[in-house]
């Protein structure tokens, strides 16, 4: 079984993802797991230290007001979806799990477009922007 897990930026997205991964590994030791995060978030350090395969997708969240920076970020988001589609195509996941953070959006979209079942884990009382 191949599983993509994506979430990042803060520990609030990363540690729930790691907990899910450990539960999967206990039940399905042969599962191949790929963690997709950003190159600048905490996950870029934490996930490889946990012994997990990690791929980074360069992406940043949008500002909550109109700005030229959002135009640039929209372009990065388009590129992130293209990169995510390549990751999904190359890894052939049986399922994709998102735990929040901007990086989960392109991964879950790419998985969904490829017909891969997706799950969103939301631990907050109010869902974040991506979830």
Regions found by a protein language model. Give the residues of each.
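Active-site-proximal region of nucleotide-activated glycan assembly enzymes
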Residues: 113-131
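Structural detector of well-ordered beta-strand residues that form the stable sheet scaffold
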Residues: 4, 34, 96-97, 119
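Short helix-capping segments at alpha-helix termini
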Residues: 25-30, 113-115
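Short beta->alpha connector loops at strand-helix junctions that form conserved
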Residues: 56-60, 99, 120-124
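Conserved nucleotide-sugar phosphate-binding/catalytic loop shared by glycosyltransferases and other
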Residues: 2-10, 30-83
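Residue-level detector of alpha-helix initiation sites
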Residues: 10-11, 101-103, 125-129
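Glycosyltransferases and closely related glycan-assembly transferases
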Residues: 83-96, 105-119
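Short amphipathic alpha-helix
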Residues: 13-25
């Amino acid at each position: 079984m191949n599983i993509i897990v994506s979430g990042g930026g803060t520990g609030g997205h990363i540690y729930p993802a790691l907990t899910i991964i450990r539960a999967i590994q206990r039940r399905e030791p042969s599962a191949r797991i790929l963690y997709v995060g950003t190159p600048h978030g905490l996950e870029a350090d934490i996930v490889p230290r946990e012994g997990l395969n990690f791929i980074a997708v360069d992406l940043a969240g949008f500002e909550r007001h109109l700005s030229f920076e959002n135009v640039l970020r929209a372009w990065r988001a388009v590129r992130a979806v293209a990169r995510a589609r390549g990751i999904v195509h190359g890894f052939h996941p049986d399922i994709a799990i998102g735990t929040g953070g901007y990086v989960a959006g392109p991964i879950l979209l790419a998985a969904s477009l490829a017909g891969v079942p997706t799950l969103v884990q939301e631990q907050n009382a109010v869902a974040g922007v991506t979830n």
